[in-house]
Amino acid sequence: MAQTVQNVTLSLTLPITCHICLGKVRQPVICINNHVFCSICIDLWLKNNSQCPACRVPITPENPCKEIIGGTSESEPMLSHTVRKHLRKTRLELLHKEYEDEIDCLQKEVEELKSKNLSLESQIKTILDPLTLVQGNQNEDKHLVTDNPSKINPETVAEWKKKLRTANEIYEKVKDDVDKLKEANKKLKLENGGLVRENLRLKAEVDNRSPQKFGRFAVAALQSKVEQYERETSRLKKALERSDKYIEELESQVAQLKNSSEEKEAMNSICQTALPADGKGSKGSEEDVASKNQGDSARKQPSSSTSSSSHLAKPSSSRLCDTSSARQESTSKAELNCSKNKDLYQEQVEVMLDVTDTSMDTYLEREWGNKPSDCVPYKDEELYDLPAPCTPLSLSCLQLSTPENRESPVVQAGGSKKHSNHLRKLVFDDFCDSSNVSNKDSSEDDISRSENEKKSECFSSPKTAFWDCCSTSYAQNLDFESSEGNTIANSVGEISSKLSEKSGSCVSKRLNSIRSFEMNRTRTSSEASMDAAYLDKISELDSMMSESDNSKSPCNNGFKSLDLDGLSKSSQGSEFLEEPDKLEEKTELNLSKGSLTNDQLENGSEWKPTSFFLLSPSDQEMNEDFSLHSSSCPVTNEIKPPSCLFQTEFSQGILLSSSHRLFEDQRFGSSLFKMSSEMHSLHNHLQSPWSTSFVPEKRNKNVNQSTKRKIQSSLSNASPSKATKS
């Protein structure tokens, strides 16, 4: 077998073609280098040449070509028929012997396995049924009894019976326990299945539930609050440390002053004992000594105040020793003239107290005046106000009035500006009227006041279009993109200050309502985010209702001529600019009408959003005049309940989005502020109490129609949910 395998592998590795005839190899022959040739071809070649035709190796009788036996199947026909029969016979005999040997081995294995199987079955029966064992033992005992009846005693039989009873009882108990455990196992399996199903159901609900919309914002708000509280605690700790150091310095200074006063008193007592007993001379000398003491104390106090650090380095034990020795000397030497020294002692105490007060003031001025470098590193960390939009008022009003906090207002403005910029990263928080946000741009306002005056003059020129602007208390809370936004906000603040002087009662009532609203605003940012989502849904419903109402109204048929409307509005704007006195009268009328509606606002109605457009002076070429209507009537200016928010009135988000698109088309730059949809909804919730608007007396129907058309065109940008759907 191994020989045939070797031949087969060799024949498979050899090439099939001959190198001489280039045909199929017949009776293959190989040279030393294993080149294959036909035997006939190599014989013909060796008649003329004694070298291999492929590798030129000499072929001699010592190194002849070797024949391959069994290389191909052409050698098989060479065998005769009888030889082939014998070969087949031998092959069959070999196979038969092999199969018989295998059958014998398998039969032996089967017998062994049967015997093992029987033994295992008997073991299983004995384990599962112990009674059979007992019965088998009893049968054996019976056989033994029958064989040897005289050998077994009745006592042994009684003992075995007792053992059998105990065994049966134990078996029954174990069986009952097994049944109980099976029932408990079934119950646990059922409970496990129910819990698994409930777990799967909860997982499916969690997978199907939409992700929380404001989860990230709530986490960011909480993180900012934690950082803010940590900064506040660090600031308070540092302030306490500084106050402790300051108190220690003051105590050391007081101890020094006491030591100096006691030393001076001891010296005075010594001088008094040394003086003669004359009354007049003693009084004169006492007065001289007192005057000298005053001069010495007045001279020594500044030096002690300037060198307080060197006195602080001295140990307290030496001071105590000095004071104790001075006291002993003063008591021993002042016993003689006790009655005479009382008045002088009182005068000296008064003089020393006055001197200490002056020296304390000078010490404070020099001590805190010489520390500008100590105050600088705390400017960015502690010297800004920390009340956030959502912090409680009790924590936001905390401030330690240490001497380092009494800095220039420029430093405080810088610190508060940095802090407000840090807090304005979160868009969805409520607007607040805290001092740090309102004083944020104080330095920028001082720097760019000249630009404000120039731009206000440009705005008041008769060439510009009519400006409808309303004063809001939240004007400084909004982020403008460029310096033009800041200057325009300042001009609007000046107009609001003028209007607030004319409407005192209305402003006071609205300020009271805002103050009460700010005091009650202690909610967390997560609740504010949920309110924002709720307001988005309400704005969607209102916009759908307004679309349905506007589709039914007959005013939708005449909205095709925008240029004519723009021309009429520009002519009206020029008339308004020619008559500034009339504008002031109209503003007074609007303020009086707004004050009449305070009762409605106090009864629970929310403030309406009246946005203002801040246009550049180069808006002469624009055809349309952006004027706001608080109602559909062109004469009256009434504040309506929240149900009419999107029907006959501009919301702030609509006006901002439409105006921003128009400004980008006209290439006037980014002069309006950018606000996200959450800030629009929150600002609609926190309405401004300073809502006043210039409304002209003469308005055409085309103006109202254009406003309604603007509402319909920009309702899709009112809420963030509709924007995401589109």
From Swiss-Prot:
It is found in: Chromosome. Its main location: nucleus. Its EC number is 2.3.2.27. GO terms for molecular function: chromatin binding; ubiquitin-protein transferase activity; zinc ion binding. Residues 280-290 have a biased composition (Basic and acidic residues). The keyword Membrane does not apply. A zinc finger (RING-type) spans 18-56. InterPro entries: OBI1 (IPR039209), OBI1_RING-HC (IPR035691), Znf_RING (IPR001841), Znf_RING/FYVE/PHD (IPR013083). One of its GO terms (cellular component) is chromatin. Keywords: Chromosome, Coiled coil, Metal-binding, Phosphoprotein, Transferase, Ubl conjugation, Ubl conjugation pathway, Zinc, Zinc-finger. Residues 321-334, 702-726 have a biased composition (Polar residues). It catalyses: S-ubiquitinyl-[E2 ubiquitin-conjugating enzyme]-L-cysteine + [acceptor protein]-L-lysine = [E2 ubiquitin-conjugating enzyme]-L-cysteine + N(6)-ubiquitinyl-[acceptor protein]-L-lysine. The keyword DNA-binding does not apply. Residues 300-320 have a biased composition (Low complexity). Residues 87-129, 155-270 form a coiled coil. Auto-ubiquitinated. GO terms for biological process: protein autoubiquitination; protein monoubiquitination; regulation of DNA replication. The modification Phosphoserine is found at S210, S526, S553, S561, S568, S570, S719, S721. CDD domains: RING-HC_RNF219. It is an enzyme of class 2 (transferase). Residues 274-335, 687-726 are annotated as: Disordered. PANTHER family: ORC UBIQUITIN LIGASE 1, RING FINGER PROTEIN 219. E3 ubiquitin ligase essential for DNA replication origin activation during S phase. Acts as a replication origin selector which selects the origins to be fired and catalyzes the multi-mono-ubiquitination of a subset of chromatin-bound ORC3 and ORC5 during S-phase. Associates with ORC complex. Binds to chromatin; association is cell cycle-regulated, absent from mitotic chromosomes, is associated with chromatin from G1 and partially released from chromatin from mid S-phase. This is ORC ubiquitin ligase 1. It comes from Pongo abelii (Sumatran orangutan).
